[in-house]
C-alpha cells in the first residue's frame, strides 16, 4: 500500500496571516486537499501563532469529524505543557513530537533519544492514554531507535531535509537515500512504523518510496503549497499521490 499523504497547512496559514483577512482559508484549502484524496491534514502550531493559529485547530477537527471522518488530523510540536493542552483539547489521531526551539523557523533535527528518554516517556504515555498515536521526529542516523521504541513511540518520522537539499546533486541524493533506507530498516525491525517529512516533492518522492516501500505516511507542506500556486490544490494533491505510488 502506498504511503499516505498528510497535507501540512502551515504555509497556507502563513500566507493568510500576511493580512488581517480570512483568506486564503486554511480550512477551505484543507477541505480541497481531502476532497482530492489526501489522507489527512497536519499542522504545527507555534507559541507565537505566526502561521497556524490556535483557533484553526478546532475548525480543522470539525472539518474532519463532520465531512471526512476517515481522514486523520496530525498535530506537530514541541511538547510544552501548553502544546499538550492543545492536543488533549482537539484529540488528533496522531501527535508528532519534535525537539524544536519555539522560535525556530522550521524543524531541522530529530530527537536525541538517549538523553531525552526520561523527558519523553511520560509525555508519550500521557498522549497514548488519551488514545492518540505518537510519532517522534528522528534523524536518519539516530543511534537511539531502540530507546524510541522503549519510550513507547508508535512511529518515527524520518527528517528528510538533507535529502531534499540534494535536488541538484544526484550523488549526494544517493548517499542520503542510503542513510534513510538504513534508518527505516532499523526502525521497522524494532516494530516502529516509519513516516517521513521535510522538503519532499513530486520529484524526490518516487526514489524515496522505492527505497522505503514500507513508508507509512509523508507530511508535506512547503513543496506542495508551492506547486499549488501553479496547479491548484486538487491537481497538486493528485500529483503527490501519484508520486507516492512510485
UniProtKB/Swiss-Prot annotation:
Reactions listed under catalytic activity: 3-amino-2-oxopropyl phosphate + 1-deoxy-D-xylulose 5-phosphate = pyridoxine 5'-phosphate + phosphate + 2 H2O + H(+)
Cellular compartment(s): Cytoplasm
Superkingdom of origin: Bacteria
Keywords: Cytoplasm, Pyridoxine biosynthesis, Transferase
Matching InterPro entries: Aldolase_TIM, PyrdxlP_synth_PdxJ, Pyridoxine-5'_phos_synth
Active site positions: 44 (proton acceptor), 76 (proton acceptor), 198 (proton donor)
Protein name: Pyridoxine 5'-phosphate synthase
Keyword Cytoplasm: yes
Residue stretches spanning the membrane: none
GO molecular function, one term: pyridoxine 5'-phosphate synthase activity
Subunit structure: Homooctamer; tetramer of dimers.
Pathway: Cofactor biosynthesis; pyridoxine 5'-phosphate biosynthesis; pyridoxine 5'-phosphate from D-erythrose 4-phosphate: step 5/5
Native organism: Brucella canis (strain ATCC 23365 / NCTC 10854 / RM-666)
One Pfam family named in its UniProt record: PdxJ
Main location class: cytoplasm
GO biological process: pyridoxine biosynthetic process
Enzyme Commission number: 2.6.99.2
Residues at which 3-amino-2-oxopropyl phosphate binds: 8, 19, 199, 221-222
Family: Belongs to the PNP synthase family.
GO cellular component: cytosol
Binding, 1-deoxy-D-xylulose 5-phosphate: 46, 51, 106
PANTHER family given in the database record: PYRIDOXINE 5'-PHOSPHATE SYNTHASE (PTHR30456:SF0)
Site positions for Transition state stabilizer: 157
